[in-house]
């Protein structure tokens, strides 16, 4: 078969125009083209047809050093990456090349990063709770197996730490495979996460096939094309795990889905499309839908997705985070005000919600305790203005009691993390759902009204709080 060869006619930042002449067939949209820049393979993805013989492409690698007249080969297919067991314990880039210095990924199976979502008839509708061991999440905004969870928060409130704790808790307790897509985040954090996984045994360097996680990175320093596609590459690996061996439960982490949108906006501007609200791409909802609709459970296996979503300037009405809302089953909102109080995880118990916090799914007791906790916290929030102006003394006895309980609940929602042990020196805690419900039930019923607030800060179960109170009294 004769190769379809074109030549570069123009390079503007990450956009490359390639001309196909001499009866060459024009490559299809989304086809991967290859060229070699100082022996370095560069992959270009066809984005637009310009005229009869030119295609406009987005580069997946650095265009530095590309020159006009350089030969480009049409592969005839979209980007394909290795999938399956061979990817475990490895880090690859958007086009499936290893970036961990451990040699080629020897997989017998490769797969296109573009796939349709599963048919309706094959999708599963069952709902089971995924216990994370994190009190505030399990009680107030529980996650579902096969659900989509959004972690919302501004810069520096703890999204990545929470994701690392979820990988630690859920991957170990759950036993399935995990895929982590690093989309446009800090390279240092990606490196830290990799070494953290090696230290905790999630990645086994001696026998990579025994590892529990595959990593796909397209970090901040990569061109927008790579950042716009790396989430699809990660999802393709997650789908391969879900569908293998008659089905698996897979965890799919994306850090950060906002960077996926941001890269899409950059690509859109480079291609000359007219921007929509706040400068985002006109195809924002379509791009997000194509990714999110593939993250789903079938009758054989599930993909549970946790997506960190950076909120620009803490504005939840920004088109990027608000477009994500429509696809999520649960939202965990991280609050700067709570982080400023020193309460970690800084999850906002009133803003965070979940579709499965329903008595038919979680049970009557869990639902009742969660709603009582929220009611106490909401009352405290509404009283804060009065306290700020008039002070605590002006409150009724009933309101004083509510404030006291709310402050204890607020502190009891904090928890030491395993992945933060190295920073805090405090042993991490995994709290079972029954212990979480029992602890908060006792708090709202007033069983622990006599204990000091400090006893509830950074503990696991309620028994630990009681023990801490005894130590504080000494």
Curated annotation (Swiss-Prot):
Primary location: membrane
One of the entry's Gene Ontology molecular-function terms is: ATP hydrolysis activity
PANTHER family in the cross-refs:
ATP SYNTHASE, ATP SYNTHASE SUBUNIT BETA, MITOCHONDRIAL
Do you know which Pfam families this protein is assigned to?
Answer: ATP-synt_ab, ATP-synt_ab_N, ATP-synt_VA_C
Which NCBIfam families did the record assign? Answer: atpD
Per UniProt, subcellular location reads as: Cell inner membrane
Q: Which InterPro entries match?
A: AAA+_ATPase, ATP-synt_VA_C, ATP_synth_F1_bsu, ATPase_a/bsu_AS, ATPase_alpha/beta_chains, ATPase_F1/V1/A1_a/bsu_N, ATPase_F1/V1/A1_a/bsu_N_sf, ATPase_F1/V1/A1_a/bsu_nucl-bd
Q: Give the species.
A: Rickettsia typhi (strain ATCC VR-144 / Wilmington)
Q: What is its EC number?
A: 7.1.2.2
UniProt-recorded name of the protein? ATP synthase subunit beta
- Translocase among the record's keywords? yes
The UniProt entry's sequence similarity note says: Belongs to the ATPase alpha/beta chains family.
Q: Which UniProt keywords apply?
A: ATP synthesis, ATP-binding, Cell inner membrane, Cell membrane, CF(1), Hydrogen ion transport, Ion transport, Membrane, Nucleotide-binding, Translocase, Transport
